C-alpha cells in the first residue's frame, strides 16, 4: 500500500511553513494520542503516521530530500527517515564491497571484513504537562530493547568455545556473485550475515550476542520544551551486532493541552472574564500565571475586550535567554439569568444615562456619525 504524502497527513499543502507544520502536528497529536484513545488501533496508526511526517518535515535535510524525491528518498538504500519504534542503523553499507568485487581491492584496499552493524535507534514518547514543559522536569521511564548478553558479553559463544571467520563468505556476511557487468548480493546462508561461525552458541542468546531486556532510565527534560521536541540519549538504543556501538534513544515530547493557557512559541495566552461593574468602576482582580495568582489593579473605563501583557511571565527557551510574555485577554462578561428585580435596576440605570454622552462616548460618537452619513446622503 502506497504511503500517504507527508503534507497530506498533516492536512497541509507543500511549502507549508515550519510554524504551520508544528501547529498541525500539535493539533493532530493531541487528537490521536494513544493515551486518549486506548485500545484504538486506528488512532495508534494515525499517531505513528503524523509523527513520522512531523519528524521528516521539521528536519531541514530530510525535508529537502523528501521535497525532491518523495518517499523514495527513505527507502532501503536511501537516507532513511526512521519509524515509530526503531529507526534502523543500516545506512549505505555495501557499496565499497561491490566495487571491490568488480575492480579488485576497492577504495583504500580494505578487502573483505566482518559486517559491523550499529544498533537500532529507538523512540519513546513522554507526554508532559504545560507546567512541566515550562519549568523542566525529570521522568523515569522503562524501555524494552536489545542489550548485550551478560552471559557471553556479546560474543554469542559459550565460554571456551571457538569463534571462527565464516569460510563461506570470508567474514563479510554477504555472498556476491558477478555475472558479466552485474553483481548479485545476498546474506550468507552459512553464518546468516554475522560473518562468523560459533562452535558452541551461547545458550542465553542463542549465538546472537544480544538479548531482549527491560531497562530503567531517568530522563531530564529541560525547561522550555514544546510539542514535537526530541531529546537524544546517546548509546541508549538497541545494542549493535558483533560488538558494534549501540544506537541512540530519541525521547519525543508531546505537551498536554492546558485548561487555562495556550502556548505560541515563548508566549502564553489566557482569557480572563470580569463583571461589568468592575470594568466600569475599576478594582483589583487575580490574574492566573504558572507561578500562581497575581493581583492586578484595573483603572476605570475598561472596554469589552482589553489586553494585559505580563512581561517575562511566559516561557524561557531551552537554549536560555529571555522569557516570553503572558498575554491576558480581559473580557467584560454580560450578566445572565437575571431576576425581575435585577432587570428593573438595570433599566433604571440605563434611564439615568439617557442624554449624557459623556458616560458613553463611543456610543454617542457612533450614532452622531451615522446621523451625519444619512444627512449627507439626502443632500
Swiss-Prot record:
PANTHER family: CHAPERONE PROTEIN DNAJ, DNAJ HOMOLOG 1, MITOCHONDRIAL-RELATED
Required co-factors: Zn(2+)
Organism ancestry: Bacteria, Pseudomonadati, Pseudomonadota, Gammaproteobacteria, Pasteurellales
NCBIfam families with a match to the protein in the record: DnaJ_bact (TIGR02349), PRK10767.1 (NF008035)
GO terms classed as biological process: chaperone cofactor-dependent protein refolding; DNA replication; protein refolding; response to heat
Binding site for Zn(2+) 2: 166, 169, 188, 191
CDD domains reported for this sequence: DnaJ, DnaJ_C, DnaJ_zf
Cofactor: binding comment: Binds 2 Zn(2+) ions per monomer.
Molecular function, one GO term: zinc ion binding
Gene, per the UniProt record: dnaJ
Record localization: Cytoplasm
Quaternary data: Homodimer.
Zinc finger (CR-type): 136-214
First and last residues of every CXXCXGXG motif repeat: 149-156, 166-173, 188-195, 202-209
Family to which the UniProt record says this protein belongs: Belongs to the DnaJ family.
Protein's UniProt name: Chaperone protein DnaJ
Function: Participates actively in the response to hyperosmotic and heat shock by preventing the aggregation of stress-denatured proteins and by disaggregating proteins, also in an autonomous, DnaK-independent fashion. Unfolded proteins bind initially to DnaJ; upon interaction with the DnaJ-bound protein, DnaK hydrolyzes its bound ATP, resulting in the formation of a stable complex. GrpE releases ADP from DnaK; ATP binding to DnaK triggers the release of the substrate protein, thus completing the reaction cycle.
Amino acid at each position: 500500500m502506497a504511503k500517504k504524502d507527508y503534507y497530506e497527513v498533516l492536512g497541509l499543502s507543500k511549502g507549508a511553513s515550519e510554524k504551520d507544520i508544528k501547529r498541525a502536528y500539535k493539533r493532530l497529536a493531541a487528537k490521536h494520542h494513544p493515551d486518549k484513545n486506548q485500545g484504538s488501533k486506528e488512532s495508534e496508526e494515525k499517531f505513528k503516521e503524523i509523527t513520522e511526517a512531523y519528524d521528516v518535515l521539521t528536519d531541514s535535510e530530510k525535508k529537502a530530500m523528501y521535497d525532491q524525491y518523495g518517499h523514495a528518498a527513505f527507502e532501503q538504500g536511501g537516507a532513511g527517515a526512521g519509524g515509530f519504534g526503531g529507526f534502523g542503523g543500516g545506512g549505505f553499507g555495501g557499496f565499497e564491497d561491490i566495487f571491490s568485487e568488480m575492480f579488485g581491492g576497492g577504495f583504500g584496499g580494505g578487502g573483505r571484513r566482518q559486517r559491523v552493524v550499529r544498533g537500532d535507534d529507538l523512540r519513546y514518547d513522554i507526554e508532559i504537562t504545560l507546567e512541566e514543559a515550562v519549568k523542566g522536569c525529570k521522568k523515569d521511564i522503562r524501555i524494552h530493547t536489545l542489550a548485550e548478553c551478560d552471559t557471553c558479553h556479546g560474543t554469542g559463544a559459550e565460554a571456551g568455545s571457538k569463534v571462527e571467520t565464516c569460510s563461506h563468505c570470508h567474514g563479510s556476511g554477504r555472498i556476491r556473485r558477478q555475472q558479466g557487468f552485474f553483481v548479485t548480493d545476498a546474506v550468507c546462508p552459512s553464518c546468516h550475515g554475522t560473518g562468523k561461525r560459533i562452535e558452541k552458541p551461547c545458550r542465553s542468546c542463542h549465538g546472537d550476542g544480544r538479548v531482549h531486556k527491560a531497562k530503567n532510565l531517568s530522563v531530564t527534560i529541560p525547561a522550555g520544551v514544546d510539542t514535537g521536541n526530541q531529546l537524544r540519549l546517546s548509546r541508549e538504543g538497541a545494542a549493535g551486532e558483533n560488538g558494534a556501538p549501540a544506537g541512540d534513544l530519541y525521547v519525543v515530547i508531546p505537551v498536554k493541552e492546558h485548561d487555562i493557557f495556550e502556548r505560541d512559541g515563548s508566549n502564553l495566552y489566557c482569557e480572563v472574564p470580569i463583571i461589568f461593574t468592575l470594568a466600569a468602576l475599576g478594582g483589583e482582580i487575580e490574574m492566573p500565571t504558572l507561578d500562581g495568582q497575581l493581583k492586578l489593579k484595573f483603572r476605570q473605563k475598561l472596554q469589552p475586550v482589553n489586553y494585559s501583557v505580563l512581561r517575562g511571565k511566559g516561557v524561557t527557551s531551552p537554549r536560555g535567554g529571555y522569557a516570553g510574555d503572558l498575554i491576558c485577554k480581559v473580557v467584560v462578561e454580560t450578566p445572565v439569568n437575571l431576576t425581575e428585580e435585577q432587570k428593573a435596576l438595570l433599566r433604571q440605570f440605563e434611564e439615568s444615562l439617557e442624554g449624557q454622552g459623556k458616560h458613553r462616548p463611543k456610543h454617542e460618537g457612533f450614532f452622531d456619525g451615522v446621523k451625519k452619513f444619512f444627512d449627507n446622503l439626502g443632500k
